[in-house]
């Protein structure tokens, strides 16, 4: 099981930039403060709405039932929490956790406007230091969040700690396309079109430039699978979606 200590005074990546690890969380949070109000709209525009299909597939693979306790980690504006709240019912609970208070407030407002009031709770916290006891959750899900974490392995260890035996982890994020042609087209779209959309819609091209770069710095499908295995998870598998542009990793804690 992973027990590596976090080293201080090290360098990590923020997109394609090298930055001291201690400021990455601040830089990432600043990005999401800037894009928060246009986040849902930009997701629909950038992915042509396909992100909703990817998230629905995550829900279908989650095996969440009535009465379950679910952690929507880095849950942002709450797309997964909306769906999980229906699955867990009145006897269950969903924790929508995000490190960014602006995103969290928008998520809370969105869910309340939908009438989701009782079985979703909201917590601002860092994924590397989850404020929960061991063996708390039946399911932990992360949707397009892991690539923004400073210490991915530490976060995965924390997830392992708070999952109950038999609990399931699901990680949905952008990944590596499976064909060279798709990679070329995807790169052209990502680097030349997405920042322009961000400038027009959100008046912020730099934040979307970072988001594009962060995708390229994220571990590929096999690397992430091995990272998850190294923590102690079992039955790790992944599903490529839209030619590998996104991938869903699933694993269990036994």
From Swiss-Prot:
Transmembrane region positions?
A: none
Q: Which PROSITE patterns match?
A: SAM_MT_UBIE, UBIE_1, UBIE_2
Report which superkingdom the organism of origin falls in: Bacteria
InterPro entries listed in its UniProt record: SAM-dependent_MTases_sf (IPR029063), UbiE/COQ5_MeTrFase (IPR004033), UbiE/COQ5_MeTrFase_CS (IPR023576)
- From the Swiss-Prot or TrEMBL record, give the protein name: Ubiquinone/menaquinone biosynthesis C-methyltransferase UbiE
NCBIfam families the record matches: MenG_MenH_UbiE, PRK00216.1-5
Question: Can the keyword Kinase be found in this entry's annotation?
Answer: no
**Is Amino-acid biosynthesis one of the keywords?**
no
Q: What keyword terms does UniProt attach to this protein?
A: Menaquinone biosynthesis, Methyltransferase, S-adenosyl-L-methionine, Transferase, Ubiquinone biosynthesis
Q: Which BP terms in the Gene Ontology apply to this protein?
A: aerobic respiration; menaquinone biosynthetic process; methylation
Q: Which residues form the signal peptide?
A: none
Purpose: Methyltransferase required for the conversion of demethylmenaquinol (DMKH2) to menaquinol (MKH2) and the conversion of 2-polyprenyl-6-methoxy-1,4-benzoquinol (DDMQH2) to 2-polyprenyl-3-methyl-6-methoxy-1,4-benzoquinol (DMQH2).
The enzyme's first-digit EC class, named in words, is transferase
Q: Reaction catalysed?
A: a 2-demethylmenaquinol + S-adenosyl-L-methionine = a menaquinol + S-adenosyl-L-homocysteine + H(+); a 2-methoxy-6-(all-trans-polyprenyl)benzene-1,4-diol + S-adenosyl-L-methionine = a 5-methoxy-2-methyl-3-(all-trans-polyprenyl)benzene-1,4-diol + S-adenosyl-L-homocysteine + H(+)
Q: In which pathway does it act?
A: Quinol/quinone metabolism; menaquinone biosynthesis; menaquinol from 1,4-dihydroxy-2-naphthoate: step 2/2; Cofactor biosynthesis; ubiquinone biosynthesis
Q: What is its EC number?
A: 2.1.1.163, 2.1.1.201
